């Protein structure tokens, strides 16, 4: 973990160049598809979006990255519409076309996972628990569906997870509880609520922990800094990506995606 973190760190860009968000002539971009699966955790069908790489070949296996939204949001937030147009498809497509990122499949789930109600009804402990319950929906229902219906590689070396705000909190929680499944863990402006010793057992460390924060975040404020300090105090190697002018929204997300997809699946 420490060795790979040292390799990644000098390559991290504070922000993505404008060209990363543009569709370029001669470049083929991935296809966004909407799908759904039955969640035994929630006892209902749940939607997700999936980004398949250009020229997706069902006879070829691809690594997979799960990218999660924040509070009150849904599966469209990280790929279609955020504060403005999301350029996730272009950022990832350009990185792959430039040979800077592996061809990959990206999954954008709806992470609210209550067994008694479909959507978030407020910012309180009950709804927080529904978001935290996504670890069960993900590992018991969504991941098996993806592995059955799409041509993905399996194992922690081929599986990444990241998320924004509440999705960043869930990414940290899931990554720390299931290091056997996820080798690359990211978080963008993560919400508070992750507690514990902020350590993995020897031999269970992920290849990479990549945390992004925005200097102008007026929602979670210094919460990411607190996580950063805890990881540093406990000697956990990680990337600390502090976006100058980054707010709690699209520009911090784009900067993170630009860097994280370049670092994933290469350790």
Describe each model-derived feature in a short phrase.
Residues 1-267:
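Non-catalytic cap/lid and distal C-terminal segments of serine-dependent acyl enzymes
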């Amino acid at each position: 973990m420490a060795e790979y973190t040292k390799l990644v760190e000098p390559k991290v860009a504070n922000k993505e160049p404008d060209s990363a968000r543009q569709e370029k002539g001669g470049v083929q971009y991935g296809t966004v598809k909407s799908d759904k699966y039955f969640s035994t955790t929630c006892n209902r069908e749940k939607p997700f979006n999936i980004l398949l790489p250009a020229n997706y070949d069902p006879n070829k296996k691809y690594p997979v990255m799960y990218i999660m939204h924040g509070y009150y949001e849904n599966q469209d937030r990280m790929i279609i519409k955020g504060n403005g147009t999301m350029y996730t498809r272009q950022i990832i497509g350009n990185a792959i076309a430039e040979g800077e990122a592996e061809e990959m499949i990206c999954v954008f789930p709806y992470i609210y996972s209550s067994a008694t109600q479909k959507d978030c009804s407020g910012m309180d402990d009950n709804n927080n628990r529904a978001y935290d319950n996504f670890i069960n929906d993900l590992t018991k229902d969504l991941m098996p569906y993806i592995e059955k219906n799409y041509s993905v590689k399996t194992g922690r070396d081929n599986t990444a997870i990241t998320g924004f705000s509440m999705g960043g909190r869930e990414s940290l929680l899931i990554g720390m509880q299931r290091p056997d499944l996820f080798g690359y863990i990211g978080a963008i402006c993560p919400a508070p609520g992750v507690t514990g010793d902020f350590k993995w057992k020897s031999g269970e460390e992920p290849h990479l922990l990549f945390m992004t924060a925005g200097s102008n975040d007026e929602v979670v404020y210094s919460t990411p800094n607190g996580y950063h300090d805890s990881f540093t105090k406990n000697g956990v190697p990680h990337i600390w990506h502090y976006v100058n002018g980054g707010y709690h929204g699209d520009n911090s997300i784009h900067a993170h995606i630009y860097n994280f997809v370049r670092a994933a699946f290469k350790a």
